[in-house]
């Protein structure tokens, strides 16, 4: 019997398997950049997918069936999510810092101009503008879903959340199509490396956010979320809005400016 409101978690293999998978993914990308095989990347993605699914399943069981997510536990989860998003903010700040450091005072090695001489950037009013419209629309639909849950309109919540997920998938597809059309590579100096690193990392966040929303979708569908206990969905919505805001900065400074 517990005499405190906190949840002391059981031993779980998923943190260590997720860590090993993340390390394998990083090593896989290094190998790929050295023109080696992509097998390690594919294996790492599979391991991350399995670990994430199992970890989410365990958390859902603890909160929905075992009743471990008390008011105090939820406060801790909220603080953890806020700190996680804050760490992600500083991660993107480092990329923008590198971009502005090079673009505001371009040196003679890149022709004393920005974009560097020989680099042909994307037209911001084609796919980038379309993707901006898609992400802004997805921010509206996820907010719609949020309010529908609070009003116990779960059918509307499911429909609007499904639209959000489809918009996220559409964004990822258009981003990939844009990369295939690019007239420069990640190895083309500071412009190519900062552009593809920042937009690619953002694209990864969109993919993760879409999976996060998909988990929330199935939890709502299986009646594991109620109008007074829905932090799992709320966390995914916070993450999605963060992705939206980062894209607005990306579009403004890396495409348009």
Curated annotation (Swiss-Prot):
It is a multi-pass membrane protein. It is an enzyme of class 7 (translocase). Its main location: mitochondrion. PROSITE patterns: COX3. It is found in: Mitochondrion inner membrane. Disulfide bonds: none annotated. PANTHER family: CYTOCHROME C OXIDASE SUBUNIT 3, CYTOCHROME C OXIDASE SUBUNIT III. Component of the cytochrome c oxidase (complex IV, CIV), a multisubunit enzyme composed of a catalytic core of 3 subunits and several supernumerary subunits. The complex exists as a monomer or a dimer and forms supercomplexes (SCs) in the inner mitochondrial membrane with ubiquinol-cytochrome c oxidoreductase (cytochrome b-c1 complex, complex III, CIII). This is Cytochrome c oxidase subunit 3.
């Amino acid at each position: 019997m517990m005499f405190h409101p906190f949840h002391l978690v059981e031993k779980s293999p998923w943190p260590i398997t997720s860590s090993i998978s993340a390390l394998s993914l990083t090593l896989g990308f290094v190998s790929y950049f050295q023109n080696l095989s992509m097998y390690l990347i594919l294996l790492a993605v599979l391991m991350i997918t399995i670990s994430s699914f199992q970890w989410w399943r365990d958390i859902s069981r603890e909160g929905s069936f075992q009743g471990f997510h008390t008011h105090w536990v939820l406060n801790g989860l909220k603080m953890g999510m806020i700190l996680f998003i804050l760490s992600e903010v500083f991660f993107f700040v480092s990329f923008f810092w590198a971009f502005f450091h090079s673009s505001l005072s371009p040196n003679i090695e890149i022709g004393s101009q920005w974009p560097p001489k020989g680099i042909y950037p994307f037209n911001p009013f084609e796919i980038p503008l379309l993707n901006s419209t898609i992400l802004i629309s997805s921010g509206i639909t996820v907010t719609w879903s949020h309010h529908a849950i609070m009003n116990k309109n779960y059918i509307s919540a499911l429909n609007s959340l499904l639209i959000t997920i489809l918009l996220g998938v559409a964004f990822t597809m258009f981003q990939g199509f844009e990369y295939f059309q690019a007239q420069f590579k990640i190895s083309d100096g500071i412009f190519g490396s900062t552009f593809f690193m920042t937009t690619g990392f953002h694209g990864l966040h969109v993919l993760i956010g879409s999976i996060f929303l998909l988990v929330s979708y199935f939890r709502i569908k299986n009646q594991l979320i109620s109008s007074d206990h829905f932090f799992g969905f709320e966390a995914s919505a916070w993450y999605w809005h963060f992705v939206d805001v980062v894209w607005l900065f990306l579009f403004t400074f890396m495409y348009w400016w």
